[in-house]
């Protein structure tokens, strides 16, 4: 059957209601077992901040400019720490076993496949540092930029759909 990996997936949607967290074990092929799910709802304040910054972006160039702003940097940190809190809540569901990989989606601010551009807010490097204090997460690899990598490989930025 091969090595069994433990993975933690973090996912948000366009509704901006919150983040879903799931822990699975898999060998990447025929074996899959769900260990736990959790959901952390955005506060109205955080939801409004996300909607506010998204409303300022109507083009790829505007997105490229806004991600240089202090408003963006502050919101990115807040979103990253929100994810960290959700991770803190769910790590117990994994039975205390080490998490091999964390799939960090972030929140899509702008998505324009025809421009070969997409941008998700959230900082994987900061997330990695913030979870290092948890024994079963300190060696976890964080993967991110799913949409960007899909677009760069001729996809539409939806790597989980055919």
Residue ranges and their predicted role:
Residues 1-162:
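Short acidic/glycine-rich loops and adjacent helix/strand connectors
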């Amino acid at each position: 059957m091969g090595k069994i990996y433990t993975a933690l997936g973090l996912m948000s949607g366009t509704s901006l209601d919150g983040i879903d967290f799931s822990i699975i074990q898999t060998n990447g092929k025929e074996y899959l077992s769900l260990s736990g799910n959790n959901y952390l709802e955005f506060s109205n304040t955080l939801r409004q901040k996300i909607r506010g910054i998204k409303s300022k972006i109507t083009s790829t160039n505007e997105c490229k400019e806004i991600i240089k702003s202090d408003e963006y940097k502050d919101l990115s940190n807040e979103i990253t720490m929100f994810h960290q809190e959700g991770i803190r809540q769910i790590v117990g569901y994994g039975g205390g076993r080490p998490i091999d990989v964390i799939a960090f989606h972030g929140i899509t601010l702008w998505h324009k496949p025809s421009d070969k551009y997409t941008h998700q807010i959230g900082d994987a490097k900061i997330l990695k540092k913030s979870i290092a204090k948890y024994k079963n997460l300190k060696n976890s690899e964080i993967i991110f930029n799913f949409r960007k990598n899909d677009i760069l490989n001729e996809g539409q930025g939806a790597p989980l759909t055919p």
